[in-house]
Amino acid sequence: MKVISRVFVFGLLFLVMLIVSCSEKEGEKVQQSDIKYDQTIIHEKDGSSMKYISGGEFEMGDYLREGNENELPRHQVYLHSFYMDINEVTVGQYREFLEQKYSSDLTDSDGSESIFPQPDWREIQAYSPTDQHPMIYVSWYDAMQYATWAGKRLPTEAEWEYAARGGQIGLRYPWGDYIDMTLANYGGGTGGTSSPDAYAPMLAGPPPSEAPAPKTLKDGDLKQKVVSYGLKNMAANVSEWCLDEWNADFYQECKDSEDIKMGSIRDPFSGGKIVDMMKGFSAVTTPRVLRGGAWNSHHFRVRVSYRNSSLPTFTSNNVGFRCVKDAFP
């Protein structure tokens, strides 16, 4: 009996110690998962305000099945946390970048300008007249150069849509299903009510009596609704470059992947590895993703799920960008 009692006592002590040990480890896990990041930070290099976007899972793609085929199928995506610029990169920020960085590393070995030409400031001023307006006429290469200099990067397409949705499910736009020109700078100052699309009356209300000029707007020009993360102009104003290579079938590939069978695909990115892309982006020749619509876009192109693309050399008066950076413990 004494032997049995001793075995029982020692066994009970071991069980108690095991429970305490596990509890301490669980406590550590909870503590790590409860790490609080600053919701808004000022990025030192370029002075941009950035919002903390808490990672999580969402369904990516066209919920309403009213867009293009490349917006389907919907698929579950899990993203790690990141910071995103509240506003698009401005003319002033880009000018500062050029003043600090423009040197031989932006030219070919023979000294001739190639994929990194100097901006035509007169053209830019016609559509973005002040340093507070979004930078335009920037190629994907230009945006990548800026992001690298600033210690940031372009968002993946999945990060962009996740941020634009702002935690909302199944909406056409970051704020809801209805759009008019008090909510976004789109349609070239005319809105989208004259569209031949069958659902145009449902999507767009009448433009205001005093339509804005057909050009970009700076922060504060439009008393728009912002998405729940506090980001601005995620719909319209300027289309925004993403890091991804364009792949019209990427959503289907994600849906068919082994990862999705486990519940969701983690941090999807079309074009290899992000680290490799950041190091070798000047060798890229394939089309890149554009998101968000622009000041002269029809409201169909302003939808959260709308996908677009262009060659990395492409520049336009309606194309700009914003940056992200990873959030690590």
Please annotate each region the language model reported.
Residues 20-21:
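C-terminal motif of bacterial Sec signal peptides marking the signal peptidase cleavage site
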Residues 74, 120-132, 191, 303-308:
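Short glycine/proline-rich turn/loop motifs
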Residues 24-33:
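Bacterial Sec signal peptide processing site at the extreme N-terminus
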